[in-house]
Amino acid sequence: MTKLSAQVKGSLNITTPGLQIWRIEAMQMVPVPSSTFGSFFDGDCYIILAIHKTASSLSYDIHYWIGQDSSLDEQGAAAIYTTQMDDFLKGRAVQHREVQGNESEAFRGYFKQGLVIRKGGVASGMKHVETNSYDVQRLLHVKGKRNVVAGEVEMSWKSFNRGDVFLLDLGKLIIQWNGPESTRMERLRGMTLAKEIRDQERGGRTYVGVVDGENELASPKLMEVMNHVLGKRRELKAAVPDTVVEPALKAALKLYHVSDSEGNLVVREVATRPLTQDLLSHEDCYILDQGGLKIYVWKGKKANEQEKKGAMSHALNFIKAKQYPPSTQVEVQNDGAESAVFQQLFQKWTASNRTSGLGKTHTVGSVAKVEQVKFDATSMHVKPQVAAQQKMVDDGSGEVQVWRIENLELVPVDSKWLGHFYGGDCYLLLYTYLIGEKQHYLLYVWQGSQASQDEITASAYQAVILDQKYNGEPVQIRVPMGKEPPHLMSIFKGRMVVYQGGTSRTNNLETGPSTRLFQVQGTGANNTKAFEVPARANFLNSNDVFVLKTQSCCYLWCGKGCSGDEREMAKMVADTISRTEKQVVVEGQEPANFWMALGGKAPYANTKRLQEENLVITPRLFECSNKTGRFLATEIPDFNQDDLEEDDVFLLDVWDQVFFWIGKHANEEEKKAAATTAQEYLKTHPSGRDPETPIIVVKQGHEPPTFTGWFLAWDPFKWSNTKSYEDLKAELGNSRDWSQITAEVTSPKVDVFNANSNLSSGPLPIFPLEQLVNKPVEELPEGVDPSRKEEHLSIEDFTQAFGMTPAAFSALPRWKQQNLKKEKGLF
């Protein structure tokens, strides 16, 4: 049986973040040189160990990659080694099965410069060489806008289409041909890959030229080379659209219980979306089917060893039983070491042995209360990661302007009503703060739960108008009633009051109720608000402070579980609600009038609020698109600032709020649809997200620290120093720079013979195709070299027989030439 060798164990580095790659050779794991990372042969299988540094520990992902022409034995060995490596890591890794052509975004993301799939494999003598070599002739089809994959295709114009980028690699010259319908970003990615091949594989001693498909006449020398190597230019195929995955499929979750009964796989459906963590028992194994797009296997810590060891084979049998494609992605999750992607398929995911955030979290029902650490406003811009965690750009002491929507227009709110938010209204709040000498803006759009649809629409429209007035600089934050973020509360210094309904308009004819009850939550000036609840006894809670306002009195009711800080903040906000003297009432010592005002005694929540297991929140970045008329979100694993492209829009999900980042060159439709797109994301999220989650719209160049803090080493000057595609193209030079090299490539001697040909003096005689095909040596015409039959053909016959020009044939690897000659009867 295949075993992880002592040599592999000895060389295995499990403490340093980064990649390690092995190829399966003669059923053994053989290390791949780091200089060739990102280059894979389609006849082989590989194992990739990715180590990531998290806040307090390391996480591990093991991928095994299956080339389309690899043998079943190699595939089996790769799977076994993956399991053994996970055992060596004591079950701390997530295992991934990757099949050529259907690699996960996480896998592609490891190779930022591009993933190159080459023909051949170890069985045909193909090696991962470190030395510079110019003996290369191939055509690479580059697919993808972000994490690109480049595969070798037939060296012929018929391989081309109008929508993609192609690299014609001729050793000393690489020609990048851009389809006329390819995007700027696809061209930039293609150029990055071409330069990577030049610098890493050829030591920088290769020319790179670019041909734009819509203007081929501008590159006559390069087109001469292409036509020489690829044959006569032909009509191009139409652009091939990228595979589109419907959001509904991603959201279609089914959880199955797995058991291995007497060697037979038995699966039983347990639940469908939305899923909760308590469905997973530590004693069992489960399969989670994400609409057939991806299969997850979860192994409970106390499950029997046979079931745990057979996790991957269970998944493959499940795929077969469901008649899913063999290339379906598989992830094996260990109990306690689950990936962020897996965790966020559940409504909430907690880990009892982890600490998260900046304070202890307590909960009753679905309401959480955070014991805040001391707030330090000076740290927000120096340490944006603190700003991101606390969701604070400063301490709320900046300048504020507030408007209310009236008759669909903006009307300034009288100063005496600042901090009062009525559920029947919508408000716009513009907050101005300084970083150094520069002004920055936050634009809050607060929408009451009882406001009319016209007012809600008008609030969004007026936000756009106000945003334009300030040159698009404000960060827009949509705040549904009840979802007020800490910074908004901090502006009112502990005096924010939210009313169930009503309005503060001067012409309001409705009178508010004579008795009102407010639940106060918060421990300091930066996190306190009073929220109106129905004035009934059953809405009390022993863990909080409540303000009960009647016509004759104002009570401050203190539950047994509230803290001293909460009582002090409640006194402050109570002064905003009522000017009358407050009567402090301790739970259990209420006067009769108190209960009478609430309509009589009634049971209410009086159990001690328990400490919640720490909620695990991993920020996730998605590239968004609605160009097809459907919302698409592509996740970017291990993201950093470089992943934010100026042409696109992105969504940063930090669970209790969602940022929508707009690049300055994004198309207008995507800019206008920012809020709608973010809401669509929440609606189609597999875990069943709260549609009222706050949405924050951020424009490139005006990012607040609450956003930048989620990125490692954010550079505010990045885009001012970044070179455009046009700049990079200009740096490559023009056709005069490589005239000598193009002359070498187009010289007649390479028309028929390749570099390995055993050339005789003078040209070989030409014979008709039918006199050479499937003929034994004794039946060949006189003068024919039996080992070089193809060189006795005319160019027309050669092209007819092989489906390509002699030059294209000569560019193929030696093993493929031999296979083609056998196939065509010319061996």
Curated annotation (Swiss-Prot):
Extent of the Gelsolin-like repeats: 27-76, 148-188, 265-309, 407-457, 528-568, 631-672
Broad class of where this protein is predominantly found: cytoplasm
Protein name in the entry: Villin-1
UniProt free text on domains: Consists of a large core fragment in the N-terminal portion and a small headpiece (HP) in the C-terminal portion. The core fragment is necessary for both actin-nucleating and -severing activities, whereas the HP binds F-actin strongly in both the presence and absence of calcium and is necessary in actin-bundling activity. The Gelsolin-like 1 repeat is necessary for the actin-capping activity. The entire core fragment is necessary for the actin-severing activity.
Entries under PROSITE patterns matching the protein: HP
Cell compartments where the protein resides: Cytoplasm, Cytoskeleton; Cell projection, Lamellipodium; Cell projection, Ruffle; Cell projection, Microvillus
Organism: Homo sapiens (Human)
Record has Membrane as a keyword: no
